Amino acid sequence: MKSSTTQTLIFTVFLLLIPTSFAAPPKLKDSFTQCVTVFKPSVPIQNFTYTQQNPNFLTILNNYVRNLRYFNGTTRKPVAIVAAAHFTHIQATINCAKKLGLQLRIRSGGHDYDGMSYLSTVDFVVLDMFNLRAIEIDPKLDTAWVQSGATLGEIYYNVANKSNNLRGFPAGICPGLGAGGHFSGGGYGNMMRKYGLSIDNIIDAKIVDANARVLDRSSMGEDLFWALRGGGAASFCVVLAWKIKLVPVPEKVTVFNVETIGNRGVIPTDLAAKWQEIADKIDNDLFIRLTLSSSNKTVKASFMGMYLGNSEKLLEIMNAKFPELGLNKTECIEMKWIESVLFWLSIPPGTAPTSVMLNRIPQKQIYLKRKSDYVQKPISKPGLESIFKILSENENVSMAWNPYGGRMSEIPATETAFPHRAGNMFKIQYSSNWFVPGEEAASDCLSQTERVFEAMSPYVSKNPREAFLNYRDIDIGKNLNSTYEEGKVYGVKYFKNNFERLVQVKTRVDPDNIFRYEQSIPVHVSR
């Protein structure tokens, strides 16, 4: 069996080396353009449709490519990009993709780590949602309608301003993430122990289905609404907008970031062991992420946290539950919740206005690979020492350990399509970033990631080895033939026992498999 590193390279090279002659013929591009025009959307679609002949085509395509591995001139290009500005543009795109036999890729923020929202091995169209970014807040009801093309930064900024900094929303720490994909995969962040995931605070949605109908929660039915929350909406429909429930945040939160390589009088593995004991059981208002990274053969443990309250109460909790860290008053920074968003971006307090989170242009572009795991039992001290050793030998890889517990353990695994609830201590994100183009650098970094991932196998969930959909990972399986059997390989890892229900919903609402991609939910074909 080929290693997942080899599989990743084969898949990537296949995408990169498709010759120009294998691109869609001009006739197909013309046919699509004519088709969406004939459909006569309410708002003229011509100015929002880009084919390869359009001088702005590559700019539009690359604006939301967030992984430099796919930012080049040799990846297969879509037949067209529709930068939808009205729901009728989406209806026209769906109908014309069906008519012409084109696959559809739906992109809201472009953060699909393995590029599945803008890549394909067959003729395809990209439905780009970045123009659909409206945010309508109802401060009396503490709700908001958020279009899928809005970014988390735009949501946070508007919610804070509209609520006088007394409301927030539980979602990710990266302001550039698009709401469409982030929410539909679950949407986790540093308030999940208090309020759960984004999907646990979504109360309605407006979609366009496979028949180009505009539906809401009532008209789509509870099964499909269930699937959209954690099951990856791109397998079922196009989400126009989400109705979210805003959550209370205090006037001040307290943040800290303690980095140690043994310089606090405690061995880092001892601190990691203690973190395991308390991180998923501590006060629900407190989230402490442990990040492990290595340089010069030395592993650094970083404890980055946020408490929904003042520093005095935080120190009281830490002194009682985690005194080994030695957190002190000078390391605690009180700020508004909206300001904490910048802190998690490593922007020093007071050095930038909160409006910086409205910037859609990334601070930097990188080549990257991400993977995920779930830990359900404490890792022994010898196990931690082994992990630190493998990290010290693969210095391009870091791990972020994100604690669960709290509200996450209270919500049943079947409440939404997202199954990773009670029984999980923490989730791991494996990160490998590099800045040098070329196959040699990519192969080295992917190999390092795979070595660390394999070394972790004794300590993580099994049968299946669970994975987080928002950390998209082509290594765990791909469905190039649109079969149930291929889909189940990765499906049970992302969705566990919820996979079969997702297949049932998919088969009912999209029997022709219009919404498909390399890791979509498959249709169950009766025999």
Swiss-Prot record:
It is found in: Secreted, Cell wall. Residues 74-249 form the FAD-binding PCMH-type domain. Disulfide bonds join C35-C96. There is a cross-link at H111-C174 (6-(S-cysteinyl)-8alpha-(pros-histidyl)-FAD (His-Cys)). One of its GO terms (cellular component) is extracellular region. Glycans are attached at N47, N72, N161, N296, N328, N396, N481. The keyword Signal applies. The keyword Nucleotide-binding applies. The FAD cofactor is bound via a bicovalent 6-S-cysteinyl, 8alpha-N1-histidyl FAD linkage. GO terms for molecular function: FAD binding; oxidoreductase activity. It is an enzyme of class 1 (oxidoreductase). Keywords: Cell wall, Disulfide bond, FAD, Flavoprotein, Glycoprotein, Nucleotide-binding, Oxidoreductase, Secreted, Signal. Gene3D superfamilies: 3.30.465.10, 3.40.462.20, Uridine Diphospho-n-acetylenolpyruvylglucosamine Reductase, domain 2. Pfam families: BBE, FAD_binding_4. Residues 1-23 form the signal peptide. Binds 1 FAD per subunit in a bicovalent manner. InterPro entries: BBE (IPR012951), FAD-bd_PCMH (IPR016166), FAD-bd_PCMH-like_sf (IPR036318), FAD-bd_PCMH_sub1 (IPR016167), FAD-bd_PCMH_sub2 (IPR016169), Oxid_FAD_bind_N (IPR006094). Its cofactor is FAD. Its EC number is 1.1.1.-. Belongs to the oxygen-dependent FAD-linked oxidoreductase family. This is Berberine bridge enzyme-like 14. It comes from Arabidopsis thaliana.
